[in-house]
């Protein structure tokens, strides 16, 4: 590693991927300089240090992005070897419980950037192969073990290395061969829970997890009230799909991390369209057997599937609270007949 070698300055350009999202905008100048360095054949490895507010997935995508005219294709001479995230052991838990947005701390000047601190931290931890747990000299041994267990639960596959001043043996972060895009996308602890790869609870600090699965819909008002007023503070991370009775066709994705809770549209359920329309979608055709094996005569493929990761979780109490948010049997009967009167105050587009 030679400190005197730096990227030359170029006119900065942006390459926007097809969906036009901010987080999928790639820097063309980075691509050009990486190609120059590779063709110079002077270096074996390139270490790219992103800003603290950058998301890891677009960085990885840069190395698999190919322009339509074929002029940009980094995969011809480079690949991602390791994704490393540095965690500030002293501030992580405080930041993780913060409801603040990046703009609240003047960390972004991108118009329309509505990312929260905790969601960014979660993305960076869940996508990493190696996590440097830095500033370990500034926390107690007990807090360090607790933090280690939390991070391990968020990303069970990552190597967690305690450091001070981010000093680490280069062999831990270079030429590891650890990165695989598909594996990285499914390395998060909540995904492993959904796929029935249960991670054992850490007994000392009670970092545990469970999956809540139901077919019946949530009552829109009762579930919203649960989220706004009684959502357990000891839940560190939760994510999954759900549906509410007032929107039978719409699938919703739920996500919480620390002090941030959000819900977004996730498309429609297959049962909301006739079979003749479903078979026009590759996602349905390729997964038809699995989808139909889980089909319900009452609700089709609609389901609630939420993963909860937290500390000292009272699974039975949380399950009871969630069950109380579901339509009861009388309400289900009225709902099927179109007699159930529902109001919908969810701040999510329908």
Residue ranges and their predicted role:
Residues 1-119:
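Nucleotide-state-sensitive switch-loop elements of NTP-binding domains
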Residues 29, 33-36, 58-62, 127, ...:
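Alpha-helical scaffold elements adjacent to nucleotide-binding pockets in ATP/GTP-utilizing enzyme cores
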Residues 30, 49, 83, 128, ...:
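Residue-level signature of catalytic and energy-coupling elements of molecular machines
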Residues 57, 221, 316:
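Alpha-helical elements of the RecA-like P-loop NTPase motor core of helicases
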Residues 92, 98-304, 329-350:
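C-terminal accessory "lid"/substrate-recognition subdomains
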Residues 226-229, 318-326:
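Short amphipathic alpha-helices in soluble, non-transmembrane regions
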Residues 303-307, 323:
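C-terminal structured domain segments
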Residues 311-315:
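Helix N-cap motif at beta-to-alpha junctions
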């Amino acid at each position: 590693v030679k400190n005197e070698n730096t990227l030359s300055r170029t006119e900065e350009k942006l390459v926007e991927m097809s969906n036009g999202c901010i987080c999928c905008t790639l820097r063309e100048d980075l691509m050009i300089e990486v190609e120059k360095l590779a063709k110079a054949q002077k270096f074996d490895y390139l270490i790219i240090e992103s800003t603290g507010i950058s998301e890891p997935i677009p960085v990885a995508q840069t190395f698999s992005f190919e322009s339509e005219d074929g002029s940009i294709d980094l995969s011809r001479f480079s690949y991602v070897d390791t994704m490393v995230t540095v965690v500030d052991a002293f501030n992580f838990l405080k930041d993780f419980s913060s409801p603040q947005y990046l703009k609240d701390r003047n960390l972004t000047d991108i118009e329309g950037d509505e990312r929260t601190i905790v969601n960014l931290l979660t993305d960076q931890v869940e996508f990493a192969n190696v996590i440097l747990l830095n500033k370990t000299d500034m926390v107690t041994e007990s807090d360090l073990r607790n933090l280690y267990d939390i991070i391990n639960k968020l990303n069970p596959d990552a190597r967690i290395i305690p450091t001070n001043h981010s000093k680490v043996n280069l062999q831990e972060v270079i030429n590891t061969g650890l990165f695989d895009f598909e594996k990285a996308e499914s390395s998060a602890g909540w995904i492993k829970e959904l796929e029935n790869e249960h991670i054992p609870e850490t007994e000392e600090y009670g970092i545990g997890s469970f999956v809540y699965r139901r077919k019946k819909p949530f009552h829109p008002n009762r579930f919203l009230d649960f989220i706004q007023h009684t959502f357990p503070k000891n839940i560190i991370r939760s994510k999954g799909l759900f549906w509410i009775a007032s929107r039978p066709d719409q699938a919703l994705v739920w996500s919480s991390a620390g002090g941030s809770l959000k819900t977004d549209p996730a498309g429609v359920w297959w049962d909301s369209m006739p079979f003749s329309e479903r078979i026009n979608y590759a996602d349905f055709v390729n997964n038809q057997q699995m989808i139909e094996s889980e089909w319900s005569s009452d609700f089709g493929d609609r389901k609630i599937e939420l993963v909860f990761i937290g500390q000292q979780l009272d699974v039975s109490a949380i399950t009871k609270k969630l069950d109380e948010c579901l339509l009861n049997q009388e309400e289900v009967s009225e709902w099927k007949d179109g007699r159930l009167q529902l109001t919908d105050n969810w701040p999510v587009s329908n």
